[in-house]
Amino acid sequence: MSSEVTALPEAAIECRNAAKAFQLYLRRNDQLAQALFGWWKQFYKEHWVLQDITFQVKRGECIGIVGRNGAGKTTLLQILCGITQPTRGTVSVNGRLAPILALGSAFDGSLTGRENAMIGGAILGLKRKEIEARLPSIVEFAEIGMFFDQPMKLYSSGMVARLAFAICAHVDADILIVDEALSVGDEFFAAKCQKFIDDFAKTGTIIVVSHGLDSLAHMCSRVMWIDEGRVREFGEPKTVIEHYRATVNAADAAEEEAA
């Protein structure tokens, strides 16, 4: 009998030549025409939001992603989380991934917070008994009290975000995907979220998108700058952020002069 233990891949995430295009239909009936006659003619234009994205994230790394609005950051996160698939290229995720805040978009407003927590935990890979055992800790972390057993259509956006964060914080994830998660509540709750992320970063893998450049420079081992759907720079945090900040400032100054 072999006593070998299969080692986990060194890379937590590997992205090779990933690209994403969306179909743009310019006329009202083009989508129907595509469904009926797409074999004969293309009735849409391709809008490429990501092009040739290649990178590797090692286990235990904290990677920051920066870029202006519309650069493709959210689409990249959606691909990593499995919400959408790349049009071409490959993405490999090795380990249990918890997409903080993205989970909130999957909640059913007609169900209670408790019911959505059960479903969310199952989506993230927990068994029913495991989820049930963690519900008290989840509701305590989320700080939503009696609303936990109320339909989520009664929740504010902040309460939805709190519950999503709380669920992701209790699923024993290997990888966290964080998209501006620290803007989900008051300073006390934001501090609680930051502490969880700091503790997780000691052993886990994190990808975080944030406009808080100083925070990224402090917590990340590397930073990726996405510009117009492509990786413009990926490396030492302070260097990448300095280049990104200079470019943004120059662009803003040019816009002010033109106004």
Annotated model-derived regions:
Residues 228-229, 244:
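Conserved ABC ATPase "signature" C-loop
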Residues 190-202:
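Helical segment within the ABC ATPase nucleotide-binding domain
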Residues 218-225:
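Conserved catalytic segment of ABC-fold P-loop ATPases
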Residues 212-218:
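Conserved H-loop
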Residues 66-68:
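The feature captures the beta-strand-to-loop junction immediately N-terminal to the Walker
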Residues 1-51, 237-259:
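Pre-NBD coupling/linker segments of ABC/ABC-like ATPases
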Residues 33-37, 98, 118, 130-147, ...:
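Conserved ABC ATPase "signature" region
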